[in-house]
Amino acid sequence: KFVQRKYYGYEIDDSKPVVISTWQSLATFDKKYFEKFDCVVGDEAHLYKSKELQKIMNACINAKYRIGTTGTLDDSKVHKLVLEGLFGRVHNVTTTRELIDKKQLADLKIQCLILKYSQDECKHVKKLNYQEEMDYIVSHEKRNKFIRNLTKTRTGNTLVLFQYVEKHGKVLYDLIGDTLDHQTRKLFFVYGGTETKDRETIRSITENENNAIIVASYGTFSTGINIRNLHNVIFASPTKSKIRILQSLG
């Protein structure tokens, strides 16, 4: 009656006063469209440092009430100032430790696995730039087979996160799938091209499973996704982003 959804798969109905939308769906709208809003609520507010989201927020010139929610801010002063300019002063309402103690977040255990490479490989990689080194790491056959074996030997539902779809995500999915007993264990692949409804279906199925594997991109399964029945997360691709790591763990 009062709420409309404005993203892929839903028809536009401007007769309803409350709009729930992705920023991608709103990015094509004219500035005038946003003048009618009195209130803006931005979930995953740490993402609002992007130019497109700032453009949308700045177009909401009549929005007196602005609320941004996030569990992760990075350590950059500039990042914090940008968000305060859009939403107002930051208020910390709780901590990760408090949420873990209240059983609202998982009491996680972090295991850092260090893979050792040959001297010749180290000498070769030393000459590469950042992107070339990343490409070398994610295409390393032994490393990918190690991730496959690690994934298959975990007990419970396991999420494997990757950064590059073609050169890493699909490779891992095929490696795991080729040697998996599909009768006893479900395997899913999720990336930017996966429909929103299909992602939700996969999430729902996993919550009712106890030994499923999801191979997913950081972009689709590191922010805004909540799987209550998840036992293991494997970071298959290297990342320096504090927010990405914390969001994935959350």
Go through the PLM ranges and name each one.
Residues 57, 73-74, 240-250:
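Conserved SF2 helicase motif VI
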Residues 1, 53, 75, 164-169:
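Conserved Walker A/P-loop ATP-binding site and its immediately adjacent core
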Residues 35-41, 215-216, 223-238, 247:
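A short beta-strand element within the Helicase C-terminal
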Residues 124-163, 167-181:
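Conserved interdomain hinge at the start of the Helicase C-terminal
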Residues 19-22, 64-71, 213-216:
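Structural recognition of the conserved hydrophobic beta-strand(s) that form the central parallel beta-sheet
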Residues 2-15, 159, 168-171, 184-222:
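Conserved helicase ATPase core of P-loop NTP-dependent helicases/translocases
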Residues 38-39, 44-111:
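Post-DEXD/H (motif II) to motif III coupling segment of the RecA-like Helicase ATP-binding lobe
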Residues 8-39, 50-55, 220:
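Conserved helix/coil segment N-terminal to the catalytic DExD/H
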